[in-house]
Amino acid sequence: GIDLTPEFVSTGQRLCDWVGLGGQVSLTQGDATAMPFSDGSFDAAFMLHVGMNIDRKEELFAEVCRLVKPGAVFGVYDVMQTGDEALDYPVPWSSTPDTSALASHEHYIDALEEAGFDLIRMRDRREFAAEFFAETRRRMEDDGGNPLLGVHIAMGESAHIKIRNMVAANALPRNFCALACSVVANALRIGVKVSV
């Protein structure tokens, strides 16, 4: 795995070590648009809540396509904007609009195809994610604060505000695709198959 934030990499590696996966998982600090790996290094790849922080989706997906073997599957699970409503900040991935790079699922698909991926399927995960954040918010309110373990550890002291803003954004008519949308594509560079 790769992350731009050194603290996330070191924490992730410690967590892998704690659960006995340290020898099977390697995390690297670096730029996801210029990764330090050889062409065709990976049999598959996935991206989980990354694209909302990277404005240059075309560069990102071209880099992933370079790194995976032909025919490899690439899964994406990101927050994608589907409406024109303004978003209240902070949100889980960004404290301010200038560090947020939300894009539509159409933009993701175009960038994936331009990079050499063929879309296998796209699935709207709005309801799943909305329920998760609503339940997280309810638990935080019921418990009078943060539980011992939870998303607040990664989100910091403003976790309750970020979660509140995501719940509110998801209540807007079709403003966000799921809070997350999953996209699966492969690096075959042949015809496009789409099923939504």
List each language-model region with its residue ranges.
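Polytopic alpha-helical membrane proteins, predominantly small-molecule transporters/carriers
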Residues: 1-2, 38, 52, 63, ...
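Short, glycine-/aromatic-enriched active-site segment of Class I SAM-dependent methyltransferases
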Residues: 79-100
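A short acidic, Gly/Pro-enriched loop at the edge of an enzyme's catalytic core
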Residues: 33-45
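Class I SAM-dependent methyltransferase SAM/SAH-binding core
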Residues: 1-34
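Conserved Class I S-adenosyl-L-methionine
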Residues: 121-196
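A short glycine-rich, Lys/Arg-flanked "PGG" loop and its adjoining helix->strand segment in the class I
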Residues: 58-73
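Short alpha-helix
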Residues: 100-122
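A short SAM/SAH-binding and catalytic strip from SAM-dependent methyltransferases
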Residues: 43-56
